[in-house]
């Protein structure tokens, strides 16, 4: 399955051809050999991709997939990062919080793995339940294919925006056991990320009562170190990032870095801005280098 999200019937032919040219080296594969765990027939309409307000939105995902963006051989350092776009667990902001991020990672010599997880939220299931299954499965698949994809399984991080940041947090804190029955050998490998990069992560605290993380977020001394970027004027409370940072430090997890910028709002991804928050990619890159993950 090549470039599964983009279809000529949904985009102008020229745009489709440009996409194929830009991402010709990517490889995509479904996460599950059959239907994904807990999926019900007819629960989700046919998958859609559309651009609204300059944002490429992917919706109605019932067959989650992983797209590999390999770093150029001469620049590759063996590190990999699983990228989780945001979208409120209802859609996926697939370009500016997805493929564009993988391109940035490639510029650092890092192989990006773009996760197309299940949306929208499933009835009678926690908002993150199906996406967490997809993320855990993806981590195992990357490690299983580490030799083929030329990545070090001990240098495999996770990066998420907004709801994708919440998904990254759940993956960072729920790695002791799989949230689904074992499928194959990939599920015998660890789904613990080496680190997390959390950009305006959502659903960490209640919007009104902001003094505690939600109880499903279980930080421990084994939680990987994290980089946080948030803004004070974000509708998603920055207290979530602050509280998680403090909890990590309290439990002796070292190497965390927190940035709370005054302005910038929400959903900016890596788009240019006059606000200092636009420097977060440089800060994150410097953090990864300082932590030793970018070494060849």
What are these regions (language model features)?
Residues 77-86:
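Short beta-strand element of the alpha/beta-hydrolase
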Residues 93-94, 100-101, 117-150, 274-277:
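Catalytic nucleophile-loop/oxyanion-hole region of alpha/beta-hydrolase
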Residues 227-230:
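Short beta-strand/loop motif that positions the catalytic acidic residue
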